[in-house]
Amino acid sequence: MRYRAVVEYDGTAFIGWQRQKGVAGRSVQESIEDAIYRLSQQCVTVFAAGRTDAGVHALGQVVHFDLNTSLQDYVIKNALNHYLRSDMVSILSLEEAAEGFHARFSAKKRHYMYKIVNRDAPPCLDRLRMWHVPKQLNVSDMQEAASHMVGEKKDFASFRAKECQSKSSVRTVDRIDCVREGNNIFVHVSAKSFLHKQVRIIVGTLVQCGHGAFPPSYVLEILERKNRAAAGITAPPHGLYLVLVEY
């Protein structure tokens, strides 16, 4: 039987979603697979909609796995949460998946949120869940810059990590919204799929634009140059959240 689950996790202590050979540390995938084994004594592979990097969090990661069991869905969910209680991972919902469902390849859209605290004083309670930017940011300039990246089939070669393995750097970004709420700024980014570190490079570029390093229109030149060196910095991972996956 194939199961589909929505997962929340704090990415601080993890090396990322995916198991990685030769890399010290624990992945979210490994934690969930170990919990399933403790429940069922079955070795399964858990697939995710988004392979988040080390330090990146999830509010609505979607996963699937195949498991032979007669247990009811709620029993599986509660048992996994019992085994995951010390790992900062929580199964929010779990159900039998439709035939052919794949957490990654069936996804129609992924929604990310990046959280910035924009004030002089660094955060204390949420320091590993937001990016502290002390220099005042102009959100209107950030939004104008973002507008140049939204639309059909733009080449984001300047906005992907050097180690990105995707064959094409062309992506359609459906939404980038920059919203200020007091000292907090939220950057919402939505697309069917993203390049490696694309969202974090977009956010880093918008932040540099927001404190006046370059005008919003410079984003057009960044896109045209198709060179990672042309874009801004890569925002740190701890401000990024995978919020929702649509199917």
Swiss-Prot record:
It holds the Pfam family PseudoU_synth_1. One of its GO terms (molecular function) is tRNA pseudouridine(38-40) synthase activity. Keywords: Isomerase, tRNA processing. It catalyses: uridine(38/39/40) in tRNA = pseudouridine(38/39/40) in tRNA. It is an enzyme of class 5 (isomerase). One of its GO terms (biological process) is tRNA pseudouridine synthesis. Substrate binds at residue 112. The active site is at residue 53. CDD domains: PseudoU_synth_EcTruA. SUPFAM superfamilies: Pseudouridine synthase (SSF55120). Its EC number is 5.4.99.12. PANTHER family: PSEUDOURIDYLATE SYNTHASE, TRNA PSEUDOURIDINE SYNTHASE-LIKE 1. Homodimer. Formation of pseudouridine at positions 38, 39 and 40 in the anticodon stem and loop of transfer RNAs. Belongs to the tRNA pseudouridine synthase TruA family. This is tRNA pseudouridine synthase A. The gene is truA.
